[in-house]
């Protein structure tokens, strides 16, 4: 992928800014998401809550299912590939989907290497818990970053932690003497020029969305007020008692995140949210956010 193609991919991801991307498992859910105002859908066979509950190896979704969803909506369609599984990514690119998410929600295929995203023309989304992770993924060719909040829990605490960590580390980099940027880049395994770019911008050079544990309009508005550019919602919509209403509510809260009255309106009469899983109760080997490096 040449520089112009990468810049185009970054611009494509910028077009999703301020919007909500929803996980969907079938055509009906995809249409609900589109009608609710989602800017894109993530096509997958099982939402994170089901992946967590059922266990086993989670792989790329059946391509035929992705094709059916792609045919059913006019908004962009994303799909997940396992960390390091570049052949799954090749298949998804051949399907001509709009974005690939190299996702820790699926079982990693490679415990040493992430996908070299510069070998692809399609934009990639990657998760990050901190600035170092984000910049390593961008150096590999990611056009979009998201938090790695603990998916399938309905608990936003980890996404908040990741965003606050990212914000704090960017502030530290901005205030760093230029001669220390080399040390920062070396210690985080990233190109010096990329670290210098972030120092100058005061933010990541790509969009950074919230993901993981977002279940309510208030969760979405919280992440936007913390500085996220948009929101991914996985299990939070279709594991709730009224998916259609909740989908519309989260879209509204994301758009009007700084208007408490609008967020209040969005929060009324939604029915039951998805059940919440306390992070401390999850066995260490089942924590998804620690996958990747």
UniProtKB/Swiss-Prot annotation:
Molecular function via GO: pyridoxal 5'-phosphate synthase (glutamine hydrolysing) activity
Residues at the catalytic site: 80 (schiff-base intermediate with d-ribose 5-phosphate)
Highest taxon of the lineage: Bacteria
Gene3D superfamilies in the record: Aldolase class I
Reactions mediated catalytically: aldehydo-D-ribose 5-phosphate + D-glyceraldehyde 3-phosphate + L-glutamine = pyridoxal 5'-phosphate + L-glutamate + phosphate + 3 H2O + H(+)
Record key words, sorted: Lyase, Pyridoxal phosphate, Schiff base
Pathway where it operates: Cofactor biosynthesis; pyridoxal 5'-phosphate biosynthesis
One Gene Ontology term from the biological process aspect of the record: pyridoxine biosynthetic process
CDD domains from the UniProt entry: pdxS
Pfam families for the chain: SOR_SNZ
Record InterPro entries: Aldolase_TIM, PdxS/SNZ, PdxS/SNZ_N, RibuloseP-bd_barrel
UniProt: D-glyceraldehyde 3-phosphate binding residues: 164
SUPFAM superfamilies found in the cross-reference section: Ribulose-phoshate binding barrel
Residues reported in the UniProt entry to bind D-ribose 5-phosphate: 23, 152, 213, 234-235
UniProt-listed Enzyme Commission number(s): 4.3.3.6
Alphabetical list of HAMAP family matching this protein: PdxS
PANTHER family according to UniProt: PYRIDOXAL 5'-PHOSPHATE SYNTHASE SUBUNIT SNZ1-RELATED
Assembly, per entry: In the presence of PdxT, forms a dodecamer of heterodimers.
Family that this chain belongs to: Belongs to the PdxS/SNZ family.
Function as written in the Swiss-Prot or TrEMBL entry: Catalyzes the formation of pyridoxal 5'-phosphate from ribose 5-phosphate (RBP), glyceraldehyde 3-phosphate (G3P) and ammonia. The ammonia is provided by the PdxT subunit. Can also use ribulose 5-phosphate and dihydroxyacetone phosphate as substrates, resulting from enzyme-catalyzed isomerization of RBP and G3P, respectively.
Protein name per its UniProtKB record: Pyridoxal 5'-phosphate synthase subunit PdxS
């Amino acid at each position: 992928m040449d520089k112009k193609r990468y810049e185009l991919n970054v611009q494509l991801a910028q077009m999703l800014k301020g919007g909500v991307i929803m996980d969907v498992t079938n055509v009906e859910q995809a249409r609900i998401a589109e009608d609710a105002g989602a800017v894109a859908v993530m096509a997958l066979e099982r939402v994170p809550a089901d992946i967590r509950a059922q266990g086993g190896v989670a792989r790329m979704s059946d391509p035929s299912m992705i094709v059916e969803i792609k045919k059913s909506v006019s908004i962009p369609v994303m799909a997940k590939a396992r960390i390091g599984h570049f052949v799954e990514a090749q298949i998804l690119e051949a399907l001509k989907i709009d974005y690939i998410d190299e996702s820790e929600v699926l079982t990693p295929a490679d415990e040493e290497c992430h996908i070299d995203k510069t070998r692809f023309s399609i934009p990639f989304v990657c998760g990050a818990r901190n600035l170092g992770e984000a910049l390593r993924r961008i150096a590999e060719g990611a056009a979009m970053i998201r938090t790695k909040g603990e998916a399938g829990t309905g608990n936003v605490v980890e996404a908040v932690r990741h965003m606050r960590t990212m914000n704090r580390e960017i502030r530290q980099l901005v205030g760093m003497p230029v001669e220390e940027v080399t040390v920062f880049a070396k210690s985080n395994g990233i190109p010096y020029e990329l670290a210098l770019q972030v120092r100058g911008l005061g933010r990541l050079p790509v969009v950074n969305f919230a993901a993981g544990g977002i279940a309510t309009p208030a969760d979405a508005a919280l992440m936007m007020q913390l500085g996220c550019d948009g929101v991914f919602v996985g299990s939070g919509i279709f594991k709730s008692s009224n998916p259609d209403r909740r989908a519309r509510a989260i879209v509204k809260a994301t758009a009007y995140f700084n208007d408490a009255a609008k967020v209040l309106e969005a929060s009324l009469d939604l029915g039951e949210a998805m059940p919440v899983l306390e992070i401390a109760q999850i066995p260490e080997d089942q924590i998804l956010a620690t996958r990747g490096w």
